[in-house]
């Protein structure tokens, strides 16, 4: 999947993608449980990217360009994040054993970080587990590329999250003049 500039985009819901795409992620440490098109997108955003993948075919396609580990033992898969002696700015849960990846993610996320949980509407127990934390949930409902039904990508942000989104022009949208009601008349 690509955007209107022919750049690969992650398979998050469009509202989530647009918000994430408006933020500068340069040098942010990102870990992803389950890699995919988002791997390429995060790297294009100049993030310091790490991940774990259990699909050998995909792993061999992208291993040269990234710090991804290949792991098919799912107990080891969910613990791969502990191989790093630092915490992450962003942790994406979008692969196998999602529920079991929550605890490791919570231990390895920075106070000002964010956990992205894709398809949270498909995983009620996982969503409820994340909702119990002190993280602030933002649920982006909508369509996503290559899907015919809507879904939810949830971002759980730390209370010290300090990344600022730039002005968002929706995909297919146009830049317009400032609307007359967007100014004070007083």
Regions found by a protein language model. Name each.
Residues 29-32, 51, 90-93, 115-117:
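Short catalytic-loop micro-motif centered on adjacent basic/acidic residues
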Residues 68-79, 92, 137-144:
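A polyampholytic, Gly/Pro-enriched intrinsically disordered region
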Residues 96-186:
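C-terminal substrate-binding/active-site "lid" region of AdoMet-derived donor-dependent transferases
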């Amino acid at each position: 999947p690509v955007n209107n500039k022919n750049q690969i985009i992650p398979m998050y819901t469009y509202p989530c993608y647009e918000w994430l795409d408006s933020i500068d992620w340069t040098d942010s440490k990102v870990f992803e449980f389950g890699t995919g098109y988002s791997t390429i997108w995060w790297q294009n955003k100049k993030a310091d990217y790490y991940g774990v993948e259990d699909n050998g075919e995909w792993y061999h396609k992208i291993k040269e360009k990234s710090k991804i580990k290949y792991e098919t033992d799912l107990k080891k898969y969910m613990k791969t994040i502990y191989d790093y002696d630092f915490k992450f700015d962003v942790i994406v849960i979008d692969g196998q054993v999602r529920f079991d990846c929550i605890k490791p993610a919570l231990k390895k996320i920075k106070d000002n970080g964010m956990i992205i949980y894709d398809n949270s509407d498909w995983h009620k127990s996982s969503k409820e587990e994340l909702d119990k934390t002190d993280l602030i949930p933002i649920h982006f409902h909508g369509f996503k590329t290559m899907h015919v039904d809507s879904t939810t990508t949830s971002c759980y942000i730390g209370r010290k999250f300090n990344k600022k989104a730039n002005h968002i022009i929706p995909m297919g949208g146009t830049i317009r003049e400032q609307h007359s009601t967007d100014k004070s008349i007083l």
